Amino acid sequence: LSEPDHSFSGPTRRRAIVIGGGTSGMLAAAALREHADDITVVERDSLPQEPAPRKGLPQARHAHLLWSGGARAMEELLPGVTGRWLAAGARRIALPTGLVSMQSQGWLRRWPETQFVIACSRDLLDWVIRERATADPRIKVLSRTELLCLEGSSARVTGVRVRTHDGEERVLTADLVVDASGRGSRAPLWLGALGVPAPRHEEVDSGLAYASRVFRAPDGTEDFPLVNVQSDARQSVPGRTTTIVPIEDGRWLVTLSGTRGGQPGGAADEFETFARSVRHPVVGELINGLEALSDVVVTRSTVNRRNYFEKVKSWPEGFVVLGDAVATYNPVYGHGLSVAAQGAVALRDNLVSHGLTAPRLAAKVQRAVARPVSLAWELAVGQDIQYPGAVGKQPGGAARLLRRYVDRLLLTATGHPAVTKALFDVMTLSGPPTALVRPGIVLAVLRGPTLPQLTAPPLTDRELALAQSPQKTP
């Protein structure tokens, strides 16, 4: 990709810089493209020109779910991106129709579609976004370039200082700098060097580790559902989960996870055993006898971390933080991608309303970005803090009361379509959390499920046949 030109000094040329060439960075660049003449993406590594692993993204080997709330946001920013994913082999799975899920209170029924999820490898997801974003001539990528520091003052960020792959140091100026560099972001340090106070920081660590392996899917499973067995945080045992995500090229990506004291290991001969050891063995049964296409990959960097940038007084002009640089979540919940997309939409919307150089734009964007972050954060840490050995701020009385209501809501969702719809609206980041406390939903929750709980996974006869004899097409 060609190198951007920062030599132009005319007063009318609007420039933006995005730190990080991952998904958050490309979405931020897409959000900026109608509001800046030149958008430079500063990326430390070389980006693949095809669906391939990206250096610095070890979590890409594990299951990633793009919930409908995030997919819609990405489609807003990059029209046609959903069709491109599907053409490349991704699956659009209806929810809850295409989901076989045991949550803490039991099996969910496969009601007609109210939401959806995009299922594919992270490599494919990222590549399509990168391909569509960089097709815009206003977006240029400066790869193999290290960001050294921010330029400017505590009142305004005016650009960045970088070191290129040949060792040259350069200053790039911009009207707006967006940090989308992910969980390794050094934004608090960069801002501190300019005299900006450090943001409040919070962590919740359940000690979760996760292990993944790719299998060749059985013949005839092109429309197989997403399968998931979740843990029950109310039990005083480590939380263990298993998930099968059907991905492109006739493969199943299987991810196991366990909190402190119950983590999966990296031994291939223990993978299926772990999958059978959770609350229901369906995932272990489904992968029995399948051809493994990869080794087991284990990741342990799963701490929930949040920087409250929106609370910093006198936030500098010209600087915004998005995506995992703001907050990272236990990946079991699959919210990181969707939150990044909704944060980029918040950036785009504020640019439309106020313009690139409007006073206090950055502070307004940072507050808007915090809204989807807060929802995903509460969903993640409210669950994780309950596990044995979890480290972090314990919930107060109000939070414990809310937890009891949510437990009752999850029980009701096992046999009540309207409650299931409200649950998926919130879980997919498609609706506000207030959807769970509307009068009709509260009344339904108080009454409880209208149907008896399922006693087995809600697989169809054909799917059951595949589960019992995975090498044969029923």
Residue positions per predicted region:
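Membrane-embedded alpha-helical bundles of multi-pass transporters/translocases
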Residues: R13-R15, S24, V41, P48, ...
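Helix-loop-beta segment of a Rossmann-like dinucleotide-binding subdomain
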Residues: Q103-R122, G159, L256-G261
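Predominantly flavin-linked oxidoreductase catalytic cores and closely associated redox partners
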Residues: A135-F274
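C-terminal helical "tail/cap" subdomain of flavin- and related membrane-associated enzymes
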Residues: R348-P474
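FAD/FMN-dependent oxidoreductases across multiple families
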Residues: A119, G262-A376
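N-terminal FAD cofactor-binding segment of flavoenzymes
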Residues: A31, P51-V100
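N-terminal Rossmann-like FAD-binding beta1-loop-alpha1 element of flavoenzymes
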Residues: F8-S46
